[in-house]
Amino acid sequence: MRTLFIGDLHLSADRLDITQAFNRFLDTELDDADALYILGDLFEVWVGDDLAAPFALELARRLKQISQRLPIYFIHGNRDFMLGKQFADAAGMQILPEVTCLDLYGVNTVILHGDSMCTLDKAYQRFRKLRSFAFARWLYSCLPKRKRQAIADKIRSNSQSSNQQKSYVIMDVEPSAVDALFAQTHCKQMIHGHTHRPAIHNFTNGCKRIVVGDWYEQGSVLVVSADGVDLKSLPFDAS
C-alpha cells in the first residue's frame, strides 16, 4: 500500500492539457493507494465555489467517484485559498488544516502547501496575513461575481509580474522557518509544494524535507510507502 502526494497543478481552462494529464494520473496511478493528498494550488485561481468553471465541476464529479474507494485530502494553496466546503463536498475532498501532522507508515510527518515558509518574501507574507482573516474572506465572498473575478485577475497579474523580479532565494523557503516547523511539530519528515522545486532534502539530524513539483511541463507525484519515498515525474505524453 502507498500514499500519494501532489500539488501545484494550477488547473485552468487555458491549460486543459494539464487537466487531461491529471485525468490520466487518476486512471493509472491510484491502484493500491491508501489515500491521495493534494497540497494546494490544484487550480490556477479560485474566486469562489459559485464561480467554478465547467471543467472544474467535471473534475469534481470524477474525484467524487474516486473518493468512494479512497480518501482524498486537500490543503489550501496560495491560488485556491477560497475553495470552500461546497466544492470540496462535491469533489469528495476533506479539507485539512494549513499545517497537518500524520503518521506515514511509522514516520511522523508534517504536510503543508509551503508558502508560509517563504518568510523572506515580505510583501507576499503581508498579503497572506490579510487573507488569513475570516472576515476578509467573507467580505470578498459578498462582492458581485464580476468584481471578485476582476480582483482575482488583478492579484494574479501582479503576482506574476512581481515574481519575475524576485530573486531565487526570496522565492524559496527560508531554512530557519523549516527548522522552526520541525521543532514545533516534532516531526521527522516534511512534505510540501509551492516552490516548484521538486527535491528530497536530507538533514544531518535525520529529518527529511520533500518538495513535490508543479505540473506545468510534466506531472509530479510523491509516493510514500513502508519502503520509503519515491518522487516521480510523469510525462504529459501518454504514449
Swiss-Prot record:
> What NCBIfam families is this protein classified in?
lipid_A_lpxH, PRK05340.1
Q: Which CDD domains match?
A: MPP_YbbF-LpxH
Which protein family is it in? Belongs to the LpxH family.
Task: Supply the Gene3D superfamilies for this chain.
Answer: 3.60.21.10
Q: Which cofactor does it need?
A: Mn(2+)
What does this chain do?
Hydrolyzes the pyrophosphate bond of UDP-2,3-diacylglucosamine to yield 2,3-diacylglucosamine 1-phosphate (lipid X) and UMP by catalyzing the attack of water at the alpha-P atom. Involved in the biosynthesis of lipid A, a phosphorylated glycolipid that anchors the lipopolysaccharide to the outer membrane of the cell.
Q: How is the cofactor bound?
A: Binds 2 Mn(2+) ions per subunit in a binuclear metal center.
Report whether RNA-binding shows up as a keyword of the record. no
Asked if the keyword Manganese belongs to this entry, the reply reads: yes
The record's keywords, sorted A to Z, are: Cell inner membrane, Cell membrane, Hydrolase, Lipid A biosynthesis, Lipid biosynthesis, Lipid metabolism, Manganese, Membrane, Metal-binding
User: Which EC class heads this enzyme's classification?
Assistant: hydrolase
Task: Identify its membrane topology class.
Answer: Peripheral membrane protein
According to its UniProt record, which reaction does this protein catalyse? UDP-2-N,3-O-bis[(3R)-3-hydroxytetradecanoyl]-alpha-D-glucosamine + H2O = 2-N,3-O-bis[(3R)-3-hydroxytetradecanoyl]-alpha-D-glucosaminyl 1-phosphate + UMP + 2 H(+)
Q: What is its EC number?
A: 3.6.1.54
Q: What is the protein name for this chain?
A: UDP-2,3-diacylglucosamine hydrolase
Name the InterPro entries on file: Calcineurin-like_PHP_ApaH, LpxH-like, Metallo-depent_PP-like, UDP-diacylglucosamine_Hdrlase
Residues reported in the UniProt entry to bind substrate: 78-79, 121, 159, 163, 166, 194
Q: Which Pfam families match?
A: Metallophos
Q: Where in the cell is it found?
A: Cell inner membrane
Q: Where are the transmembrane segments?
A: none
Q: Which GO terms describe its biological process?
A: lipid A biosynthetic process
